[in-house]
């Protein structure tokens, strides 16, 4: 940064509120600009970024992933997995023994949380993605 710019910046830092307001008015008149237009542009940037965060929060489909099943808990987890997935005994057993596996894709938030609670109560480690 040049010395001239640094000096101007230091002078601006030393202004009180009344002097800063007077400076803004003088700049508006001298250069025929509107300082409120600059702040309006910044206000418009905020709503643009808000929908992006709203989209993240609006996730409606979740995957329920069976991460781990301890050996002593396999039978109790198997009893929960069968009615949740509609699988037969052999298929459910294979699924429980080959973790990590996706149990259900595209489940609603309520269904995913219910499945997670039932499986965790049976002793499994579950992740909802």
UniProtKB/Swiss-Prot annotation:
Signal peptide: none annotated. GO terms for molecular function: mRNA binding; structural constituent of ribosome. This is Large ribosomal subunit protein bL12c. The lineage of its organism: Eukaryota, Rhodophyta, Bangiophyceae, Bangiales, Bangiaceae. GO terms for biological process: translation. Forms part of the ribosomal stalk which helps the ribosome interact with GTP-bound translation factors. Is thus essential for accurate translation. It is found in: Plastid, Chloroplast. It comes from Pyropia yezoensis. Its main location: plastid. Belongs to the bacterial ribosomal protein bL12 family.
